[in-house]
């Protein structure tokens, strides 16, 4: 089968002819229809420091996808051949304390599809049936293919009450932009998103952000005055991993504010803890999606009218995968879809 593999420990990703994966009694065999390129895939392509420490070589990459079930393990219940599915990319152990307590998103032994094991950039993917999620008929393939990053946005955004609240999002990557759309959809008052990439800020405006702020040219506190905000943001969603962005968030949070952190800093990050202490801030780390509450919320949000379509900006045939990676690496894109049909 065709597959995109991290074949060598250097920059790049390569089309290979890989053996069709073998499935176990509890697995599904999924024929991939569409995949999306994640920022993680770009890290793997670039072969940066994180990738060098994390990624086994060779390995088929990719973890954002939609496909069709074409075979079902003999112990599997609840899935049938022909089901349209995406899936949770965090394969959990099932036996640690958190797994046994039903908090599987906090499994300490997680293995990542397309990160620690072969992934979805292939004609076929084997996935434990536990991890699969049936896609409702009224959700198109393009949106189903980005459920993984959409789930990061939903998990982060819905960590705290948003109704009538003022929200600051630092980092206008696709996940931050989708989080802005979620916040507005569920009833936040002002949703302000910051970045220095004007292309991405324009996308955030299309997706409903109250204000998309280029911090290279605008002062965040001036924007707050413009919006009539007198006390600070109630909720912060840190999506960038950039220290200066987090520092700006701490400076502009209201007392008693709540911060959810998804962005991963490139190294250790010094912060002024006195601001957190004296403001009484609550900080929550976010990793992945809650299994499977976040997934049901994702489907329901789309079915209730949340429009994510502007975030998908490019489509390519899998044979043109290099063009897709070039678009993602340029920073001048939203989500990039690779078609496998």
Curated annotation (Swiss-Prot):
Q: What positions does the entry give for Zn(2+) 1 binding?
A: 38, 63-64
For this protein, the record's Pfam families field holds: ADH_N, ADH_zinc_N
Task: Give the gene symbol.
Answer: tdh
Q: Which GO terms describe its molecular function?
A: L-threonine 3-dehydrogenase activity; zinc ion binding
GO biological-process terms attached to the record: L-threonine catabolic process to glycine
Q: Which domain of life is it from?
A: Bacteria
Pathway the protein acts in: Amino-acid degradation; L-threonine degradation via oxydo-reductase pathway; glycine from L-threonine: step 1/2
Q: What does the cofactor field's note say?
A: Binds 2 Zn(2+) ions per subunit.
Question: Which prosthetic group or cofactor does it need?
Answer: Zn(2+)
Q: Please give the InterPro entries that the UniProt record associates with this protein.
A: ADH-like_C, ADH-like_N, ADH_Zn_CS, GroES-like_sf, L-Threonine_3-DHase, NAD(P)-bd_dom_sf, PKS_ER, Zn_alcohol_dh
**Into which EC class is this enzyme placed?**
oxidoreductase
Protein name per UniProt = L-threonine 3-dehydrogenase
Q: What is the active site of this protein?
A: 40, 43
Subunit organization: Homotetramer.
User: Which catalysed reactions does the entry list for this protein?
Assistant: L-threonine + NAD(+) = (2S)-2-amino-3-oxobutanoate + NADH + H(+)
Q: Which PANTHER family match?
A: L-THREONINE 3-DEHYDROGENASE
Reported EC number(s) for this entry are: 1.1.1.103
Residues involved in Zn(2+) 2 binding: 93, 96, 99, 107
